[in-house]
Amino acid sequence: LSWSALALTSAYPTGAPTSACFDMIPGHFASPQSEPAPYIITTPVSAVKAGDSIEVTISGKTAKDTMRGILLEARQGDKIVGTWTVKPNDNFSQLLNCGEPGNAVTHKHHANSEDKQTVSYLWTASGHLEGDVVFKVTIVKDYHTFWVAVPSAPVKILSHH
């Protein structure tokens, strides 16, 4: 019993567990914030062709709105779609397998680095994908302060034919 209690109370300093993939809720035993998130998710365009890539940026609205942890996914309805690219020198982020390799991004252990105010990743739409996609991110500011599945504006995926 004490081992399971210890395991359940861990703060996932090495990234979100795959058990968080669907509901995007961190296992912090605290309630998510009820006020709107002080973060925005932006893309340079509102439409992209299937098979193409788009940069997705998550930013705090002020310098105090930093991120200690994230879980980022692209969703079409409830389905996680597409794949992500994390820069090789990124000391904050890593890919997560939420049913498919590289279809989510999470934080990694970063004890010696600072929390981030802005992060960007490249997302690639699958070649067969069509319709609207929404980027959703769970953002952890600290153990007790987090927002779950903050949505972006929809991005339209156009047929590559």
From Swiss-Prot:
Glycan attachment residues as annotated in the record: 91
Secreted as UniProt keyword: yes
Keywords of this entry: Antibiotic, Antimicrobial, Disulfide bond, Glycoprotein, Immunity, Innate immunity, Secreted, Signal
Residues in Reelin domain copies: 12-161
Cysteine disulfide links: 21-98
Signal peptide: 1-11
GO cellular component: extracellular region; membrane
Coiled-coil boundaries: none
Keyword Metal-binding: no
Subcellular location: Secreted
Domain of life (superkingdom): Eukaryota
GO terms (BP aspect): defense response to bacterium; defense response to protozoan; innate immune response
Pfam families to which the protein is assigned, alphabetical: Reeler
Function per UniProt: May have antimicrobial activity.
Sequence similarity: Belongs to the insect defense protein family.
PANTHER family named in the record: CELL WALL INTEGRITY AND STRESS RESPONSE COMPONENT 4-LIKE-RELATED (PTHR45828:SF9), CYTOCHROME B561/FERRIC REDUCTASE TRANSMEMBRANE (PTHR45828)
Protein name (record): Putative defense protein 2
